[in-house]
């Protein structure tokens, strides 16, 4: 019997590149999604920083009244923002080469589109990269599923909402005060506080914070003692150790007696699934709510829904909220609303004093 040994030919440059891209031995995993993620996020970050510092005022409402958003034009960290592209641009794709000059591109808010489009592509690829690394390591894919919640929220406010409203000028400004302005105007125009999907999102975020604090404090309070009183309890854990670092039975017994037995998980896996799923599902619903309100399927309207025997309105908190909404609405984009028909909040003029008789 003869055995022939043949030396394997050296890998091509492309094969070496592919091996490096998909290698899990790199300090930071790149992956094929990373090939697109890295340049897009770098572009979005670079443009955002430059625009936040030095961009000239933007004609956001399309009425030749520019709004300054950068630091060099008088803003601070809190009031500054990358101002959304002009209402005169609407939903048109507005890259630099579509403008007659760089000055025109800046005046019409071109940097906003550049930032959000590259940012969205980047976070989509980041989510895909999470799946890709999980796949390479033989892990389950739930990390990218959890990250899909903030991705959905960002997509809703930066892409879906402007599409529904017909202009990228309605997108969320890229700044602290701009975010608050977006929230207030959103409430005025869509009554988001009265939308059940927003309520589910609030329950998801606040509930997730509560459950996280409860879980962390329970675990910290039931650690297995491995150190003396003079040492930090953190030294009692060695990375990769096989034994449990806390007593789940003690934690279960404590919480079961504090509330009631079945309020406490006795399965660590189902507990951590719950901790992950609760806020994710809540944020999914909020993103879905914003996406439906983008097309003006708004929150509940209970205005003037309670009348006395004489037909007079008995105000509820819904009516108080409506008055706040009207105040928000009348104060935003003041010069763009020449005929604010949506603020016709005066006394109603009766068009028929009594219903006509129908003989049938």
From Swiss-Prot:
Prosegment location in residue numbers: 345-360
Annotated Gene Ontology cellular component terms: photosystem II; plasma membrane-derived thylakoid membrane
Residues at the site labelled Tyrosine radical intermediate: 161
Subcellular location: Cellular thylakoid membrane
Post-translational modification: Tyr-161 forms a radical intermediate that is referred to as redox-active TyrZ, YZ or Y-Z. C-terminally processed by CtpA; processing is essential to allow assembly of the oxygen-evolving complex and thus photosynthetic growth.
Residues binding pheophytin a: 126
Residues where chlorophyll a ChlzD1 binds: 118
NCBIfam families, per the entry: psbA
Similarity comment: Belongs to the reaction center PufL/M/PsbA/D family.
Record's protein name: Photosystem II protein D1 2
């Amino acid at each position: 019997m003869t055995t022939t040994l043949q030396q394997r030919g050296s890998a091509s440059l492309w094969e070496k590149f592919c091996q490096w891209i998909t290698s899990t031995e790199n300090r930071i995993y790149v992956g094929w999604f990373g090939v697109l993620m890295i340049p897009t996020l770098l572009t979005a970050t670079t443009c955002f920083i430059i625009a936040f510092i030095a961009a000239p005022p933007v004609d956001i409402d399309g009425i030749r009244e520019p709004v300054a958003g950068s630091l060099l034009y008088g803003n601070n960290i809190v009031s500054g923002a990358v101002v959304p592209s002009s209402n005169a641009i609407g939903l048109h794709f507005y890259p630099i080469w579509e403008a007659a000059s760089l000055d025109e591109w800046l005046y019409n808010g071109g940097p906003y589109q550049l930032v959000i489009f590259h940012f969205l592509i980047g976070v989509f690829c980041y989510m895909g990269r999470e799946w890709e690394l999980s796949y390479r390591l033989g892990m389950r894919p739930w990390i990218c599923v959890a990250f899909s919640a903030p991705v959905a929220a960002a997509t809703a406010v930066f892409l879906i909402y402007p599409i529904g409203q017909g202009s990228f000028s309605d997108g969320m400004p890229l700044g602290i005060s701009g975010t608050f302005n977006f929230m207030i105007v959103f409430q005025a125009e869509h009554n988001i506080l009265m939308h059940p999907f927003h309520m589910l999102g609030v329950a998801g975020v606040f509930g997730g914070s509560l459950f996280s604090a409860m879980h962390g404090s329970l675990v910290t309070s039931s650690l297995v003692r491995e150190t003396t009183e003079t040492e930090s309890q953190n030294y009692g854990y060695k990375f990769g150790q096989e034994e449990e670092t806390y007593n789940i039975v003690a934690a279960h017994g404590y919480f079961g007696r504090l509330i009631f037995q079945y309020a406490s998980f006795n399965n660590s896996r189902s507990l951590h699934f719950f901790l992950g799923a609760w806020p994710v599902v809540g944020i999914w619903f909020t993103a879905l709510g914003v996406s439906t309100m983008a097309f003006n399927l708004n929150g509940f309207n209970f205005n003037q829904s309670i009348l006395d025997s004489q037909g007079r309105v008995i105000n509820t908190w819904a009516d108080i909220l409506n008055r706040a909404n009207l105040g928000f609405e009348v104060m935003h984009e003041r010069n763009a609303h020449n005929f604010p028909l949506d603020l016709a909040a005066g006394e109603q003029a009766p068009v028929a004093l009594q219903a006509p008789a129908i003989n049938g």
